[in-house]
Amino acid sequence: GRNCDILLNGKDITWQVRRPEVDANVSQVSAYAGVRQAMTVQQRRIGARGRVVMVGRDIGTVVMPDAGLKIYLDASPEERARRRYQELLARGEAADYEEILAGVRRRDQIDSTRDLAPLRPASDAHRINSDGMDAEQVFSVVMNLATQDDPPAS
């Protein structure tokens, strides 16, 4: 389902960036050094504003390596494909589980073997395997970590 709103120049593009054709091409586009560098600059600007939650395959290792709390949220390819499949069906879109699974595996392979910012957890990240967990359970684990690492108010 929909967990957040993604806006571009004030226009809601949440579902557009979740389309299979975007997912199928994001690894190839992000492999360009210029694209990655421009994105990293923008993401760091956002992070410099203060407390922020960022999602991305290189946030903890490249974009925000000094972040106070890093979480490497993972799930098996099968679980991620199942979730995407269910999301597409819930939106009334056609979906093929095997095709989605192949795409997840292909993206993992590309991202984990690329020379520039390969997919890997930061050494100081809290690793969470979310297989079999629903969104509320994952949220609970993350919030527990966030409040443990949160400095007391002065």
Model-found features: residue ranges?
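ATP-dependent NMP and nucleoside kinases share a basic, alpha-helical "lid"
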Residues: 14-93
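Canonical AAA+ ATPase core
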Residues: 60, 81, 90, 100-102, ...
